[in-house]
Amino acid sequence: MIPQTSSLPKPHGGVLVERIRVAHPREYDHLPALELDERAYADLELIATGVYSPLEGFMGQADYLSVLEEMRLTNGLPWSIPITLGVSAQDAASYRKTVRLTKDGRTVGLLDVEEQYRPDKEHEALAVYRTTDLAHPGVAALFARGDVYLAGKVQLLTLDRGPFPEHHYTPRETRQLFQERGWQTIVAFQTRNPIHRAHEYLHKVALESLDGLFLHPLVGSTKSDDVPAPVRMAAYKVLLERYYPQNRVLLGVYPAAMRYAGPREAILHAISRKNYGCTHFIVGRDHAGVGNYYGPYEAQAIFDHFRPEEIGIHILKFEQTFYCVTCAAVVSPRTCPHDTQHHLVLSGTRVRELLRAGSPLPPEFTRPEVAEVLRAAYQTL
C-alpha cells in the first residue's frame, strides 16, 4: 500500500492499495484453479490496482452485511456495493486455502481464502438494486453467480490492459499524469454511451472553473444493446480531437463491469474516481440507471446520506440538459424558459433505433463527426 503525499485527494481510507505481485504464473500451477468471468476479473483488477481502495480482497461476510445494511464497511468508511466472488457450492469445497485465479485458462492472480459464506441473494438484490426482477441486468447477473462467496486478500499476477492499452491507466498512473500536467482540480465523467451535445455541455461548464477533465468511459461488460466499447472509443477520440482543448483532457478507460445499480453505483463510481486522483465527479440524470427502476435524480440525492468529507470528492449535480430549438443552444431547466415542445431529447433506445435504420442523428443531438462514426459502425454490426 502506498501512502498519499501529493496535493491530490487522499485515496479512500488514506492509502492507495496495490496488490500486484511480480512472479511467473507457472509457479502456481499446483494450486486449485478458479476461472473468472469478465466481471470477476474486472473486480480483481480494480482491487489490486487500488481503484477499490481500501479493499484488499473480496469482502468477508461482516463487511458484506454492513454494506448492504449501512452502506459502510465495518470500519465505518462509506461503501455502497458488495465486491464479492461467487462459486458453486460443489466447487467451494475445493477452495480452502490459496486459489489460483485464471482468465481464459491463464493464471492471472491469487486468492488467499479466509472465509466462505452463503449470501441471501434476494436480500442483496433488494438492498443494492431495489428489486428482485430478473429483467434487471444487475439482478440477473447476481442470481447467475455461484451460491457461495469466497472472501480473502488477492494478488494480481497479470494486468490485462485489454483492447485499449494506451488508455488503460491505473490510479498510480493517473495520479502521476495529473501531477505532471499541473492539474490540481480534476473532474471525472463516467459514461457507457457515446458523447452527445448535452454531455459536452456538462464537460465544458466544469472546465470553465477546473483544471482538467478525466473522460472515463466504462468498457467492462454492459447490456447487449449498449453501444460496443470500440465504437464508443472511436467516437470519443474524434470528438476530443475536434472540439476539446487537448491539454486539458485525459481519456482513460474504466474497466469495471456495469452493475446498473443506480444510486448505489453512483457512490462506487465517485469513490473510484477519487482513488484515481480526481477532485470532482459529475453525476447527471439517472446515473447508472436502467429502465424505470430508479428516479431520475436519486443518484444525486443518495450522496446526502454522507458528510461531504466522508466521500472526499466534490459531487457536481446537473439536471437534465437538452437542445432547445428556440434558444438554439444546449440548455437546462435552469436556463431555458421554453416548454418541452421546444426541446430535442433523444433516448438511448431511440438513438440505437436510428443507427440500426441507417438514419442520420440530428446535429443538435451530437457532433457530425461522432454521428458518422456511429453510423458507419452500425452498418457493419
UniProtKB/Swiss-Prot annotation:
InterPro entries: ATP-Sase_PUA-like_dom, PUA-like_sf, Rossmann-like_a/b/a_fold, SO4_adenylyltransferase_pro, Sulfurylase_cat_dom, Sulphate_adenylyltransferase. Belongs to the sulfate adenylyltransferase family. Keywords: ATP-binding, Nucleotide-binding, Nucleotidyltransferase, Transferase. This is Sulfate adenylyltransferase. One of its GO terms (biological process) is hydrogen sulfide biosynthetic process. CDD domains: ATPS. The keyword NAD does not apply. The gene is sat. Pathway: Sulfur metabolism; hydrogen sulfide biosynthesis; sulfite from sulfate: step 1/3. It catalyses: sulfate + ATP + H(+) = adenosine 5'-phosphosulfate + diphosphate. Coiled coil: none annotated. It comes from Chloroflexus aurantiacus (strain ATCC 29366 / DSM 635 / J-10-fl). The lineage of its organism: Bacteria, Bacillati, Chloroflexota, Chloroflexia, Chloroflexales. It is an enzyme of class 2 (transferase). Its EC number is 2.7.7.4. GO terms for molecular function: ATP binding; sulfate adenylyltransferase (ATP) activity.
